From Swiss-Prot:
It comes from Pseudomonas syringae pv. tomato (strain ATCC BAA-871 / DC3000). [4Fe-4S] cluster 1 binds at residues 25, 29, 32. Keywords: 4Fe-4S, GTP-binding, Iron, Iron-sulfur, Lyase, Metal-binding, Molybdenum cofactor biosynthesis, Nucleotide-binding, S-adenosyl-L-methionine. Monomer and homodimer. Binds 2 [4Fe-4S] clusters. Binds 1 [4Fe-4S] cluster coordinated with 3 cysteines and an exchangeable S-adenosyl-L-methionine and 1 [4Fe-4S] cluster coordinated with 3 cysteines and the GTP-derived substrate. GO terms for biological process: Mo-molybdopterin cofactor biosynthetic process. [4Fe-4S] cluster 2 binds at residues 258, 261, 275. Its EC number is 4.1.99.22. Residues 9-220 form the Radical SAM core domain. The keyword Iron-sulfur applies. This is GTP 3',8-cyclase.
Length: 332
């Protein structure tokens, strides 16, 4: 008997779901949200049970990888229990989480026990003052303690996510690599994505391409192309000096990955986003609440939504913004 498969109209298989469990965060990163952010009312967001119901239907339809995101997922009460329920879904191969690391010193071990298979941890600077400037509220030492707690808990192939910005942290690229090598961490260097209008931050001035990142790395290390894949948008390389770790590049501007896109996103409001860089969406919360106890209705809405998935995004790296929602409203 063949496995169920979700397909879009371009015959791309969709088997990766990113789910935002909250729009709230204890950081205010300059590329993610405005400093004075207004968050969604509690009644407007999905309950943990509703998030689990959506995950259950996606896995029944062939999804093999789920990533929980935010905002910061670990500030939502009950998220460890949610992880345990999702990890137990028959057929799911990977349950991952993207986090800023601020809560991992106390939650890494419970997450590992709950069945989370991999962590991505955001880290854009190793300088405490610059880290504070970029996150507006973050404590670098607490994040590093969280990274060490993840290693101690048993997580492997933990990945650092670094958004590289010209004039802000591009000079730290090789220092971040050295930090990753020392702790046996993978790294993804990410081109900034133009989501939401942030008046105090110019994306045109801060854009730094993946090609520029590789040039900077080549000043200290030897990059070797790799065929590794984690079912996500990263294109991976290895380092001759540290072959055990993977170096990824997420390049939505300079080398977009739309042609092989295999993922969709669920916002915490229950909108199923078919593309990070477009507003095509389906309101799954409305389906859940209009037809409780009828999972077949939710499945049909998911299947039908695949036909709305566009071929590609329309990102630019000037200050023009095609998508007005912030990254924390999207699920990073």
């Amino acid at each position: 008997m063949s496995e169920p498969v979700l397909m879009d109209r371009f015959a791309r298989k969709v088997d990766y779901l990113r789910m935002s469990v909250t729009d709230r965060c204890d950081f205010r990163c300059v590329y993610c949200m405005a400093e004075e952010m207004t968050f969604l009312p509690r009644q407007q967001i999905l309950s943990l049970e509703e998030i689990h119901q959506v995950a259950e239907r996606f896995v029944a339809l062939g999804t093999r990888k789920i990533r929980l995101t935010g905002g910061e997922p670990l500030v939502r009460a009950g998220v460890v229990g949610l992880c345990e329920k999702i990890a137990a879904l028959p057929g799911l191969r990977e349950l991952c989480m993207t986090t800023n690391g601020s809560q991992l010193d106390k939650l890494a071990a419970p997450l590992f026990k709950a069945g989370v298979t991999r962590l991505n941890i955001s880290l854009d600077s190793l300088d405490p003052q610059r880290f504070r400037e970029l996150t507006r509220t973050g404590d670098l030492h607490k994040v590093i303690a969280g990274i060490d707690a993840a290693n101690a808990a048993g997580f492997v192939h933990t990945k650092l996510n670094c958004v590289v910005m010209h004039g802000r942290n591009d000079h730290e690229i090789n220092d971040l690599l050295a930090f990753a090598i020392d702790r046996n961490l993978d790294v993804s260097f990410i081109e900034e994505m133009p989501l939401g209008i942030i008046s105090e931050h110019s994306r045109a001035e801060s854009f730094y391409s993946s090609d520029q990142v590789r040039e900077r790395i080549a000043e200290r290390y030897t990059l070797i192309p790799s065929t590794d894949s984690t079912q996500g948008p990263s294109r991976y390389w290895r380092l001759a000096q540290a072959p055990g770790i993977r170096i990824g590049f997420i390049s939505p501007h300079s080398h977009n990955f739309c042609g092989t896109c295999n993922r969709v996103r669920l916002t915490v409001e229950g909108r199923l986003l078919l593309c990070l860089g477009n507003e095509h969406s389906v309101d799954l919360k409305a389906v859940l609440r209009a037809t409780p106890g009828q999972p077949e209705k939710l499945e049909k809405a998911i299947i039908d939504a695949m036909q709305l998935k566009p071929w590609s995004h329309n990102f630019t790296h000037d200050d023009g913004v095609q998508v007005v929602r912030f990254m924390n409203m999207t699920g990073g």
